[in-house]
């Protein structure tokens, strides 16, 4: 889990890169869940919340989401 204070220290480009990585991870977790291979269901919720945090910080910095 990332803290908002850690995210605020990053540049907009780094945040966008982090956001893309999180979206990829969320997709992968959804596919694992659909195929029955997912063992850590809590990761889905944690990744969704991390995506929300990154989007919030991007909005604060004025970077388009």
UniProtKB/Swiss-Prot annotation:
Q: Tell me if Phosphoprotein is a UniProt keyword of this record.
A: no
Q: Look up the record and give one Gene Ontology term from the biological process aspect.
A: translation
Q: Which SUPFAM superfamilies match?
A: Ribosomal protein L29 (L29p)
Q: Which GO terms describe its cellular component?
A: cytosolic large ribosomal subunit
- Keyword annotations of the record: Ribonucleoprotein, Ribosomal protein
The record ties this protein, via InterPro entries, to:
Ribosomal_protein_uL29, Ribosomal_uL29, Ribosomal_uL29_sf
Annotated Gene Ontology MF terms?
structural constituent of ribosome
- Superkingdom per UniProt: Bacteria
Gene3D superfamilies given in the database record: 1.10.287.310
Cited Pfam families: Ribosomal_L29
Record-stated family: Belongs to the universal ribosomal protein uL29 family.
* Cited NCBIfam families: L29
What protein am I looking at? Large ribosomal subunit protein uL29
**What's the source species for this entry?**
Methylococcus capsulatus (strain ATCC 33009 / NCIMB 11132 / Bath)
């Amino acid at each position: 889990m990332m803290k908002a204070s850690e995210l605020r220290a990053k540049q907009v480009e780094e945040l966008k890169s982090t956001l893309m990585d999180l979206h990829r991870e969320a997709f992968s977790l959804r596919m694992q869940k659909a195929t029955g291979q997912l063992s850590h269901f809590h990761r889905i919720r944690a990744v969704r919340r991390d995506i929300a945090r990154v989007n919030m910080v991007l909005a604060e910095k004025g970077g388009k989401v």
